[in-house]
């Protein structure tokens, strides 16, 4: 029974080992998932080196190796399991081993002084010395000392030979890296035009500090000058106010004689309808103004086009002078309250609106004329018919007489309501996108 159980356990363990050998260690242990957000994209050289590491068994690390290999490595460094109830016993054994290891350590030091070829064991091997018995899968004891004696010297020699080669290689790599770094630093300095020596750097810093100090002093001086100027201005204003107040007291009624030649006023209309000029010196004459009437939009447009053609025929300098003159004239007329019609776009819009209104009124007038003519003709017919009925009814009894027709009123034309109600903008605009 025990043999069959052992066989089954071995089979199961070998199956699990096979599965672990297929799983990469980085997915099984997942130690780098905590620092995953710090991950950066590998360069082409790094990815190439990783591929080479996978193929080379000496350069393989925990990322490239399988889960089984990592587990075996951890088993080598693992400490022995303490069974429950044997903790104190284990502690006593450990103290005894520590005491013996101290004595052995002293003897080993003496041996190293006498014989330099003998190599001291590593810390991991010292921990392995504490374990005297190791069990295999079947439960059989394997003595550790015999195994240790066979493997220890070869490993130490290999390590020593590797370290010497590595030291030489490291020195070469360090020298190459230093030379590269120096070259890069010098290249960057030349690009940003940095000063070469330390003295030049210090001189540049001093120069910058001096410039800053000079700027600060200049700004302070400007502020002081502004303050002095503001104080002097305030003193001048105070003195002017005092002088003005004295003059007012002296002159008295001479305020009415203030010269208002340079002052322009807007359109001022009196109760009787008379209007004053912009300088308030005289009344404005209500004479007939030159040019077309206010509502004659077409004439205004023609006048504007003629003026534009005349302006285009002149030189550039004359055009500029004329425009400046017209600008002032326009401002003066607007100040007087005269409406100026010199916007071509608005004039054309007004003409278009007036023409549309004319067309609409023409249609309404023709419709009204037709209705009036129809009513006149219908009334005439009705009258003639009533006269005929009246003639026919003579000599007949009342119950046999034909009734007279009523007076023709005409078709009721729907009256338009007062006010503007707008229209529904449902139809598409003419000439719009189809």
From Swiss-Prot:
**Annotated region described as Disordered, given as residue ranges:** 32-257, 375-434
**Residues forming coiled coils:** 162-230, 293-360
Q: Is Nucleus a UniProt keyword of this protein? A: yes
Family statement drawn from the similarity comment of this UniProt entry: Belongs to the SURF6 family.
- Provide this UniProt record's keywords sorted from A to Z: Acetylation, Coiled coil, Nucleus, Ribosome biogenesis, rRNA processing
Modification N-acetylserine, positions: 2
Q: Which InterPro entries match?
A: Rrp14/SURF6_C (IPR029190), Rrp14_N (IPR029188), SURF6 (IPR007019)
Gene behind this protein: RRP14
Instruction: List cystine links.
Output: none
Q: Name one GO molecular function term.
A: RNA binding
Instruction: State the species of origin.
Output: Saccharomyces cerevisiae (strain ATCC 204508 / S288c)
GO cellular component, alphabetical, reads: nucleolus
Q: How does it assemble?
A: Component of the 90S and 60S pre-ribosomal particles.
Task: Name the chain's protein.
Answer: Ribosomal RNA-processing protein 14
Show the ranges annotated as biased composition (Basic residues).
Answer: 393-408, 425-434
């Amino acid at each position: 029974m025990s043999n069959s159980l052992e066989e089954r356990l071995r089979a199961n363990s070998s199956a699990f080992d096979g599965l672990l050998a297929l799983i990469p260690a980085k997915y099984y242990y997942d130690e780098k998932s905590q620092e995953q957000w710090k991950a950066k994209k590998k360069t082409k050289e790094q990815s190439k080196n990783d591929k080479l590491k996978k193929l080379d068994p000496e350069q393989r690390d925990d990322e490239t190796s399988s889960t089984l290999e990592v587990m075996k490595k951890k088993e080598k460094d693992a400490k022995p399991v303490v069974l429950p109830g044997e903790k104190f016993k284990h502690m006593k054994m450990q103290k005894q081993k520590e005491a013996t290891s101290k004595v052995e350590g002293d003897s080993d030091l003496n041996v190293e002084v006498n014989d330099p070829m003998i190599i001291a064991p590593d810390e991991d091997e010292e921990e392995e010395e504490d374990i005297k018995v190791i069990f295999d899968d079947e439960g059989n004891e394997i003595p550790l000392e015999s195994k240790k004696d066979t493997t220890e010297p070869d490993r130490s020699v290999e390590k020593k030979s590797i370290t010497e080669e590595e030291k030489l290689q490291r020195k070469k790599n360090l020298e190459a890296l230093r030379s590269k770094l120096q070259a890069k630093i010098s290249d960057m300095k030349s690009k940003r035009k940095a000063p070469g020596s330390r003295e030049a750097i210090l001189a540049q810093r001093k120069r910058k500090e001096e410039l800053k100090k000079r700027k600060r002093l200049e700004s302070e001086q400007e502020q002081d000058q502004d303050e002095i100027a503001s104080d002097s201005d305030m003193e001048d204003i105070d003195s002017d106010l005092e002088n003005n107040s004295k003059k007012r007291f002296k002159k008295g009624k001479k305020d009415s004689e203030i010269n208002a030649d340079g002052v322009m006023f807007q359109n001022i209309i009196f109760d009787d309808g008379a209007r004053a000029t912009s300088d308030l010196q005289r009344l404005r004459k209500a004479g007939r103004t030159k040019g077309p009437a206010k509502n004659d939009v077409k004439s205004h447009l023609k006048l504007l086009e003629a003026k534009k053609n005349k302006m285009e025929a002149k030189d550039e300098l004359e055009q500029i002078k004329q425009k400046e003159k017209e600008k002032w004239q326009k401002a003066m007329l607007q100040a007087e309250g005269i409406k100026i019609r010199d916007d071509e776009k608005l004039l054309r819009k007004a003409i278009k609106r007036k023409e549309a209104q004319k067309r609409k009124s023409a249609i309404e007038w023709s419709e009204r004329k037709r209705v009036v003519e129809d009513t006149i003709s219908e009334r005439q017919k009705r009258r003639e018919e009533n006269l005929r009925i009246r003639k026919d009814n003579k000599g007949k009894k009342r119950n046999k007489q034909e009734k007279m027709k009523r007076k023709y009123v005409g078709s009721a034309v729907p009256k338009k309501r007062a006010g503007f109600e707008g229209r529904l903008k449902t139809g598409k605009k003419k000439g719009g996108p189809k």
